[in-house]
C-alpha cells in the first residue's frame, strides 16, 4: 500500500504542477497586437551606474528564461535627449497578464535600476496593421524615428480613416500604434526603423496627409539610437 501511495504522489503531483504553470507560460508567448512602451531619465551623474544596472537586470531576464524581446533605445534628438526608452511588442492581452516571474522581476529592478533613474512614462499601445507597413514589431535597426501625435478630442476616427486611405503608398517600414492607456488621449505613435540618419533625413515620402493637419493638437518627432547591449532577445539587422 505504501508503494502504491508513493506511485500516486509521483504521478498526480507533477500533473498538478504542470496544470498550474503551463497556462501562464503559454499565455506569455501568445502573440497579439499590444505593445508596452516606457521611458525613464537617468539621474544626474548616474548614467554609467544606470546602464550597468540595466544590463545586470537584463541578465536576470535571461536567467529567468523570459520569452519576450525587449528593445532599448537612447533618445538622440529631441527635448528628452539622453533619456532611455524601453519597449516590448507583439503581445496578447493574456500575455501582458503573464510576464515572467513579476515579483522577482520587480525585486531585481528595484535593486539594479530604480536607484539611478526617474520613471517618467509607461503606456500600452495597440498596433494598427491597416494603417501600417510592417509586422507590428519594429526591425532593430540602428536608428528609429519616433513620432508622437496628440489629436483633438473626437477626431480619432477621421484620423485613422485618412491614414488608412494612404496605407498602400507607404514605401518603408512604418508602424502605427493607438495608445490604450498611459497618457493623453487620443494619442498615436508612429515608428519608422531606419539603418542611419541619412535614411531618415532623405526620405520625404512619409509625411502625414494634409487632410489630418486640422485634427492634430501636437506632434513630437524624436530620433532614437538602438542600444544593443541594453536590449534583450533581438536579432539585430545586419548581424
Model-derived regions, located:
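Short S/T/G/P-rich N-terminal loop/turn motif that feeds into the first structured element of a domain
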Residues: 19-239
